[in-house]
Design a protein with these regions (language model features):
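Ligand-binding pockets and gating/stacking loops
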Residues: 1-428
Length: 428
């Protein structure tokens, strides 16, 4: 029997916004136009945020964070020093290297998931795919555990940029990621239609309110209440003073250039602006890591320069503003790539050993957890599991990893599977 889900694989931003553009809620419009009282800096003193930099396709540890220059398959790239003594990374990441006082590397992550979809699911939820249940993504967990505690906050608690993000699963549609498909483009339907004046909007609000209230009273399932809550949140967002964080047209040209004008650079800049306003979770995706051929030219001409500029600027800005103390940053992908270079000058799927980078939010910087052998093949020190990473992220966000949820069908599910514990080396 399949687990009863409140929501399927997610709700598109188009559906989320389009219907609100021609309808509204049964509450006085003035209430939604009232400015928020919370100051962003005060908000951030007591609340944590997480930014996940998602590298879809499976990035190579051998060419980023765990170089093996002595190996026959070490590749073309050379290691360079970072701000952390003894920690070396790729020569094509010099800006990120300067930020390693606040970043650490896990070099011994491993799993059995070498398929893109399964690996993506595993890394986002901490659980291997199971046909009987859709687990909640970490962003939705952060929204549920932390975002709901923010009163009068009109932006979404979970936002995905350049990606659809991971489903909220059994947590319901109110915690499904709000999707920004292109951070360089205006978000469609963020404002009411020009031909809908205030009086017309109020009439629609009353009508929708009657329909929604009757729908909920008829007890048509938990999803009916979620549906109303989503519309409520959306309308408040349309009139929020914090909505400009989702727009980059007013950002100075020099600042745009520091991050890069591409979708990933702009996404990282938007992520910083969102956490400055108190958004709990933002994921920014950079695809193109499935390098089965010509990996060295592809990386040095494309993804690595983009990553270096955007990630370097992001960590630098969070550090200078002090937000790094309350903002967890995680760089990760679905799995790694083979240490051995194939006949097409590429690397293939490799879940046996790979690296992720983590920092901020109370994580100690300049650390290296785990190690692979001289060829980057086998883990020779401190193997780390995906559930351990999930537990570590939860702890950094102030969430108890052992927290247990009960799905609508009564199934107990913990945040971290297999009794996984946080990686203590990153906290002491």
């Amino acid at each position: 029997m399949y687990e009863h889900l409140i929501t399927p694989e997610g709700m598109s931003r188009r559906h989320f916004m389009r219907h609100l553009a021609t309808t509204a809620l049964a509450v006085p419009a003035a209430q939604f136009m009232t400015a928020l009282t919370a100051n962003a800096k005060e908000l951030k003193k007591n609340n944590k945020s997480c930014i996940v930099l998602w590298m879809g396709g499976g990035p190579s540890h051998m060419d980023t964070w765990d170089l093996k220059p002595e190996s026959d398959h070490g590749g073309e790239f050379k290691p360079i020093a970072t701000a952390a003594p003894g920690v070396m990374i790729s020569e094509h990441l010099p800006k990120v290297a300067k930020q390693f006082k606040n970043l650490s590397i896990i070099r011994s992550l491993n799993s059995k998931e070498g398929n893109h979809d399964r690996g993506t699911y595993f890394m986002h939820t901490g659980y291997q795919p199971n046909p009987t249940v859709v687990h909640a993504g970490f962003g939705s967990i952060c929204s549920y555990e932390l975002g709901e505690k923010l009163e009068n906050f009109d932006l979404p608690h979970c936002i995905a940029i350049n990606t659809a993000g991971q489903s909220a699963g059994f947590l319901g549609m109110t915690h499904t990621p709000f999707v920004v498909q292109d951070p360089n483009a205006p978000i469609a339907n963020l404002l009411p239609p020009k031909d809908v004046n205030e009086m017309r909007m109020e009439r629609r609000m009353r009508m929708l309110g009657l329909v929604e209230n009757r729908f909920v009273k008829e007890k048509r399932g938990i999803a009916s209440g979620d549906h109303k809550a989503v519309y409520d949140k959306t309308f408040r967002m349309m009139n929020s003073q914090y909505t400009p964080a989702l727009k980059l047209d007013s950002v100075a040209a020099a600042e745009r250039d520091r991050y890069g004008r591409g979708s990933f650079g702009s996404g990282c800049l938007m992520a910083r602006r969102l956490v400055e306003q108190g958004v709990t979770f933002v994921e920014v995706a950079l695809g193109g890591w499935d390098n089965h051929a010509d990996i060295f030219n592809t990386l040095k001409r494309g993804n690595l320069p983009q990553l270096d500029k955007a990630m370097g600027a992001l960590v630098e800005d969070l550090t200078s503003s002090g937000l790094i103390e309350n903002t967890l940053i995680v760089w990760m992908g679905d799995f790694g790539r083979t240490p051995k270079v194939n006949q097409n000058s590429g690397r293939d799927h490799w879940p046996n050993s790979w690296s992720i980078v983590i920092g901020g939010g109370g994580i100690k910087g300049g650390r290296v957890v785990g190690a692979t052998d001289k060829d980057g093949v086998d883990i020779v020190d401190r193997p780390v599991s995906v559930p351990e990473v999930m537990a570590t992220m939860a702890k950094a966000m102030g969430i108890d990893p052992s927290t247990q949820y009960t799905t609508p069908r009564g199934r107990p599910i913990k945040i971290a599977d297999e009794g996984a514990k946080p990686i203590k080396e990153l906290f002491s």
